[in-house]
Regions:
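C-terminal charged capping/lid subdomain of soluble metabolic enzymes
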Residues: 2-11, 16, 24, 313-375
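ATP/NTP phosphate-donor binding region
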Residues: 2-110
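Glycine/threonine-rich beta-strand-loop-alpha-helix active-site module
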Residues: 91-195
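Glycine-rich phosphate/pyrophosphate-binding beta-alpha loops
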Residues: 160, 266-290, 295
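Carboxylate- and glycine-rich phosphate/diphosphate-binding segment that chelates Mg2+/Mn2+
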Residues: 168-270
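Short alpha-helical scaffolding segments that buttress acidic/His motifs in well-ordered protein cores
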Residues: 213-217, 257-265, 279, 299, ...
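Catalytic phosphate/nucleotide-handling subdomain of diverse soluble enzymes
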Residues: 281-320
Length: 375
């Protein structure tokens, strides 16, 4: 299938004097319908001994569902149910780490995250903190983690976030929303089972899928774009267009969106996201708006920066009869807007990717507030 050429307009150049990052990738992946059933076989060789448990962090949505009975519990393994109603917080990570350390004499054999982006990010952060001193907020930033994380496995139950493949774990801290960006964050193993996404409600499916779509648009139109990120971004965009604008079967749609999420995550791993994500962080920090919805609330007003992408987005919204919340920022005070603007502008790498090195002169605080006021 052909995607729109003007969505892939950045010219790729090379520079022999550039020092390139040596990014990590997930070393092992299982993909396929029903592949969750192989989890026991995957974990068995990684168990240290009978006293070193596997800790399963699971979205509490599944607490009374059949999925729990399929988890290969042995010895003193523990399941911890976690609510995904709110964005993952640094203090939440610290509390889980403390609970594990107080409960078990031996360090766990590994951490398994089962859920959407919130659970996948929590599991990555817990795996890091169990092998590193201090608190989660100490590692919010870039390359601050000094020791490898505990063995950890990611199993997404919704598609779109790219958290299963990324080298970041985005956390809401006391002062900022920022990821733990580290080579030690990436999962050691991922299981991609499209059947696990069957229970996802329609709107959540759409908003999380749009996270993936926006990853593609921001990556493919960014100044950080390179042939590596472009190849993944183009494939992810192609899959998103098939899923959200073409008539494919439900089963095929689940497969394609799960792979779009993977490819979209790979694209931004070697480039960066852009304006929608930076502004969404502000909405999440101040108003607690979930990431996928926040991206959509912002992206609909970014036609000046991503004209073709926003046009496609509106077609997707119309096709699936999605109603975005209105008047979200209507009653905010000037102090509220100052917080939104400061949080968003703090994401400097995202702005540089979107607008170039002169981004501070292009996106002034006043101009940014004007966009927020439309939401």
């Amino acid at each position: 299938m052909k995607t729109e050429n003007n969505l892939k307009k950045k010219e790729i150049t090379s520079n022999q004097n550039t020092s390139y990052r040596n990014f990590p990738m997930v070393p092992r992946v299982v993909f396929g319908q029903g592949s969750f059933n192989q989890l026991g076989d995957v974990l068995l060789p990684k168990r240290h001994n009978s006293e070193a448990p596997f800790i399963f962090l699971i979205d509490d949505f599944f607490e009374d569902k059949g999925l729990v009975g399929r988890i290969p519990i042995m010895f003193n393994d523990e399941i911890i149910f976690v609510s995904a109603e709110e964005e993952p917080k640094t203090e939440q990570v610290d509390a889980i780490v403390q609970r594990i350390r107080e409960t078990f004499e031996e360090s766990p054999s590994g951490i398994i995250g089962i859920g959407g982006g919130t659970l996948l990010d929590l599991a990555k952060a817990v795996a890091i903190l169990l092998n590193n001193k201090g608190k989660a907020q100490d590692y919010q930033g870039w390359d601050l983690v000094s020791k490898p994380s505990l063995y950890h496995v990611g199993i997404p139950t919704i598609s779109g976030t790219g958290a299963e493949v990324s080298r970041t774990t985005v956390l809401l801290g006391p002062e900022k929303k920022l990821g733990i960006n580290s080579d030690f964050t990436t999962y050691d193993q991922v299981i991609l089972d499209p059947d696990l996404t069957i229970t996802v409600p329609k709107e959540q499916w759409f908003f999380t899928g749009m996270d993936c779509f926006i990853h593609c648009i921001e990556s493919l139109n960014g100044t950080y774009l390179n042939a590596f990120s472009q190849s993944y971004g183009e494939k992810a965009l192609e899959l998103c267009i098939e899923v959200f604008l073409e008539d494919v079967s439900i089963e095929e749609s689940r497969d394609k969106l799960m792979m779009a999420s993977w490819h979209g995550g790979m694209s931004i791993a070697y480039s960066q996201v852009g304006i929608a994500h930076a502004m969404s962080y502000g909405l999440s920090y101040l108003l607690g708006i979930k990431h996928g919805i926040g991206n959509c609330l912002v992206f609909q007003h970014l036609e000046e920066f991503y004209p073709e992408g926003v046009q496609l987005f509106h077609r997707m919204v119309e096709k699936h009869s999605i109603h975005l919340p209105q008047g979200v920022c209507a009653n905010l005070t000037q102090n509220d807007f100052d917080i939104l603007v400061n949080v968003a502008l703090g994401m400097e790498a995202l702005w540089e990717n979107a607008l170039g090195k002169d981004w501070k002169n292009i996106m002034t605080p006043e101009r940014l507030q004007e966009i927020y006021q439309k939401i």
